Swiss-Prot record:
One of its GO terms (biological process) is vascular endothelial growth factor production. Glycans are attached at residue 100. It comes from Paralichthys olivaceus (Bastard halibut). Expressed in kidney and spleen. Low expression in liver and gills. The gene is il6. Disulfide bonds join 96-106. It is found in: Secreted. It comes from the Eukaryota. GO terms for molecular function: cytokine activity; growth factor activity; interleukin-6 receptor binding. This is Interleukin-6.
Length: 230
């Protein structure tokens, strides 16, 4: 993958680390060398008691939003981004249903889904070992898992893939075709972006008072014009 956005992604990582320290949030996964770099920008108003208000969401969604640009830079219009629709994975985590699903159940699904993505990241790393998007997505995903579990009544109910399940997941994605493996890796990052955006909407709806929910259907405003996925 192209590395031209490394500086921006490193800035996002440093901002995440500072904000997490300020909020006292645990980091579920912490790499030996965490992403770092200088940062600048306006401060955001944070409401620590609401999971959906955590700045970690916008940081990781902002990072994964760079994926389409990197995909297009790599393939130079020879392969359209929508072509990834042909590389569907049955192992991709499901979103929280819009109705008849409690907040606790939604939190559990999100945490377990992110644990699954942690395994899928190993396939991405195999194909793109120097991917800065992967580096920051993995780091922020670990932080988000910790925040989600803090909000759960029974965080011990969250299941993590066993070694055997992890091996099976990675084996299912293996393919003799280099192109096929790369498309699978790209689709993982693409679907992670969607999973996170949908997850934030789902949690925001469940945290929002019913009166406010009627006025605001839980739509997240764009993080930044340059982060739009088309």
């Amino acid at each position: 993958m192209a590395s031209k956005h490394n500086a921006d992604l490193s800035s996002a990582a440093m901002l995440a680390a500072l904000l997490l320290c300020a909020l006292g949030a645990p980091v579920e996964y912490e790499p030996t060398d965490s992403p770092a770099g200088d940062f600048s920008g306006e401060e955001q108003e944070v409401t620590p008691d609401l999971l959906s208000a955590s700045p970690v969401w916008d940081l990781i969604i902002g990072v994964t939003a760079h994926h389409q640009k990197e995909f297009e830079d790599e393939f130079q219009q020879e392969v359209k981004y929508r072509f990834l629709n042909h590389y569907k994975l049955s192992s991709l985590p499901a979103d929280c249903p819009s109705a008849n699903f409690s907040k606790e159940a939604c939190l559990q699904r999100l945490a377990e889904g992110l644990h699954t993505y942690m395994v899928l990241f190993k396939h991405v790393e195999k194909e793109y070992p120097s991917s800065s998007i992967l580096l920051h997505a993995r780091y922020h995903s670990g932080a988000l898992i910790g925040l989600i579990k803090e909000k759960m009544r029974n965080p011990g109910q969250v299941t993590v893939p066993t070694s055997r399940q992890e091996q099976q997941l990675l084996q299912d994605m293996d393919n003799p075709s280099t192109f096929h493996r790369k498309m699978t890796a790209h689709n993982i990052l693409r679907q992670l972006h969607n999973f996170l955006r949908n997850g934030k909407v789902a949690i925001r709806k469940r945290e929002m008072p019913k009166q406010k929910r009627r006025k605001d259907d839980g739509i997240i405003p764009p993080i930044h014009p340059s982060y739009q996925m088309t």
